[in-house]
């Protein structure tokens, strides 16, 4: 059964690969389903020599593409941070009163864990005291929204500094590194001891090196921006406040591995992130910093966005690849790993948002500074999200190896209520008794 499924998946991948990344099959399925006048799905299937059942199977997999979801007008966040805060039932009642009982649904974690009361309406996210202005929101009026608090407590900031906050800085750094030997870039990442920030902890330099040596007539770079864990909004911070850092990391990866195309898979629950990245990409293209023959070199690299449609599993790299290809987002058997057989069965690097931003920070600030923080297995700095139960909620850049007691009591300012335990690492993480913070540090081990 597994062999048959892998064989069928490979056929779909190859057929989907003929369409290419720019107008990928998942994008076509999503846009068609969400259109006011959808095309007969049989026509799309026929156009690409695919079975209708394949497209129906993919379409039915995603929450946002189901009729039951499309009939709603507003969605209340049901992430664990909002649920634990006890704000959502009253919020749901208010929205039902304004819009109707059958017009309010639920959506999983909108990344507003620092203020709660989160809900989604007409393509935008709202939270905190925004519900008090619901009449203005329904009328389509813009309202002032609170921004999450962010601050670096790191010895050296790699993720929150302003060294790549303008297109001029992007141009200067790109001009420098496109003249640098690719092996030197890989060596910098290896020497830094940077490991993947998405959870697996695989050495980033090693992943880039493996893919650079893989045989293939086409290679891809994917930014995994499907941040689905409740309580996490660090990727959202980087996408919205440090988009050039993330994009620069992708460009450098493309340069090293020999890729001319990349894609950011951003969850649909983050409309502001999609807007910020899209704006940055368009700006860089206008300046000739993305596209054909960048800065007059023979290196070409283009970027696009793929918008997730409500599937938590897409945070797993093989499920994410399946999604872009227009398949059901199901985890594939490994090996082969994406670095040798990834998107459309071509060598592919899949990196998390924070990993790419950290790679940029390392190239700009130096690998020695990064590796000197923390230890060999947990080096550098890490973004930590503290939700609304802390007196100082927000996203912070913190040295690896920092005691959890310091993070909770000094940086977080203690708690607004008496706590027994805390959740770490999202649904797949764990619940840890509060007493254990005396024995824990911020690291991967």
Model-found features: residue ranges?
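Feature of Fe-S/electron-transfer and energy-metabolism proteins
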Residues: 1-445
């Amino acid at each position: 059964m597994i062999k048959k499924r892998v064989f069928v998946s490979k056929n779909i991948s190859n057929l989907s690969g003929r369409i290419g990344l720019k107008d990928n099959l998942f994008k076509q399925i999503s846009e068609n389903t969400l259109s006011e006048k959808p095309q007969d799905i049989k026509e799309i299937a026929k156009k690409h020599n695919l079975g209708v059942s394949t497209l129906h199977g993919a379409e039915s997999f995603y929450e946002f593409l189901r009729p039951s979801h499309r009939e709603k007008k507003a969605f209340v966040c049901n992430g664990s941070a909002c649920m634990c805060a006890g704000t959502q039932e009253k919020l749901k009642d208010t929205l039902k009163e304004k819009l109707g009982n059958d017009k309010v649904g639920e959506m999983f974690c909108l990344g507003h864990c620092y203020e709660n009361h989160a809900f989604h309406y007409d393509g935008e996210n709202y939270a905190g005291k925004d519900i008090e202005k619901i009449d203005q929101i329904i009328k389509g009026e813009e309202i002032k929204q609170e921004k999450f608090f962010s601050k670096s407590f790191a010895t050296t900031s790699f993720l929150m500094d302003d060294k790549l906050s303008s297109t001029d800085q992007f141009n200067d750094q790109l001009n420098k590194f496109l003249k640098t030997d690719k092996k030197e870039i890989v060596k910098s990442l290896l020497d830094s001891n940077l490991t993947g920030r998405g959870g697996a902890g695989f050495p980033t330099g090693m992943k880039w090196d493996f893919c650079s040596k893989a045989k293939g007539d086409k290679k891809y770079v994917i930014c995994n921006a499907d941040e689905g864990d409740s309580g996490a909004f660090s990727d959202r911070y980087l996408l919205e406040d440090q988009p050039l850092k993330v994009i620069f990391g992708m460009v450098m990866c493309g340069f090293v591995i020999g890729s001319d195309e990349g894609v950011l898979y951003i969850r649909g629950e983050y409309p502001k992130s999609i807007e910020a990245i899209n704006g940055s990409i368009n700006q860089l293209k206008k300046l000739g910093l993305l596209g054909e023959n960048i800065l007059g070199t023979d290196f070409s690299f283009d970027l696009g966005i793929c918008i997730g449609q409500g599937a938590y599993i897409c945070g797993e790299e093989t499920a994410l690849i399946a999604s872009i290809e227009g398949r059901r987002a199901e985890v594939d058997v490994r090996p082969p790993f994406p670095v040798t057989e990834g998107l459309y069965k071509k060598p592919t690097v899949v990196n998390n948002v924070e990993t790419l931003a950290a790679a940029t920070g390392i190239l700009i600030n130096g690998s020695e500074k990064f590796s000197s923080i923390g230890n060999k297995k947990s080096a550098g700095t890490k973004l930590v999200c503290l939700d609304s139960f802390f007196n100082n909620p927000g996203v912070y850049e913190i040295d690896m190896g920092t005691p959890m007691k310091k993070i909770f009591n000094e940086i977080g300012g203690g708690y607004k209520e008496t706590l027994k335990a805390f959740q770490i690492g999202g649904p797949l993480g764990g619940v840890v008794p509060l007493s254990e913070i005396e024995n824990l540090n911020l690291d991967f081990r």
